[in-house]
Amino acid sequence: MIADSIHQKGYLIADILTSIRGLIALYLGYICWQGRSVLDAFLILIFGAWLSDCLDGYFARKSYRLGHLAEFDGWVDWAIYIITLAYGTILGHYSWTFFAFFLTLNILAFWLSKSIYVNQAFHFLYILLGFRTVWLESIFWRRFFVLWVAGVIFFKRKRLLVQIREFISGWNYLLNRKISKLD
């Protein structure tokens, strides 16, 4: 009964979750400028965005259909990653020069390659930089996110392997394209 409903309407749930994540991104962009005073709220919203990203993918895959907002899913994720890096920069863990360089490198690499895999490779790097910020800021959140990641790795091993392959493919594509243009 429930599986049938998810199969028929799962893409609508995925669209709702993508919309919620978009609103979370807007709010994160608004509050990130307040610095450490909003650390807990910021990380709770990041966790909510991460959870909604996992769930919208689940519902879309179970319905075997992309929702109307599926094309915006990666862009919403990218906005959240940029905001997270900006927040780490505001907290003093990265310089604004590094932030600008990294963002420019991401945009140029994606623009030159026209490959979603290249952008996903950068997404992975944004996640690592975000984890570094959490690691340096809060013992509680460090433990929370380590447990969360361990759970994701345990329960979503196959999906994680796919994402690792996409990460490696993205960098291979970008680097091989650059090397072939130099020849």
Regions found by a protein language model. Give the residues of each.
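Membrane-interface helix-boundary signature
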Residues: 4-17, 35-42, 69, 73, ...
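C-terminal membrane-associated helical module and adjoining short loops/tails
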Residues: 1-11, 43, 108-183
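Membrane-embedded alpha-helical segments that form the functional core of polytopic membrane enzymes
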Residues: 16-68, 100, 104-105
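Juxtamembrane/interface motifs at transmembrane-helix termini
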Residues: 47, 79-80, 164-165
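Multi-pass membrane catalytic core of lipid/isoprenoid biosynthesis enzymes
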Residues: 14-18, 62-113
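Core segments of transmembrane alpha-helices
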Residues: 18-27, 74-85, 100-105, 120-133, ...
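Sequence-level detector for tyrosine residue identity
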Residues: 11, 27-30, 58, 64, ...
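Helix-coil boundary and interhelical linker segments in multi-pass alpha-helical membrane proteins
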Residues: 23-44, 82-98, 132-145
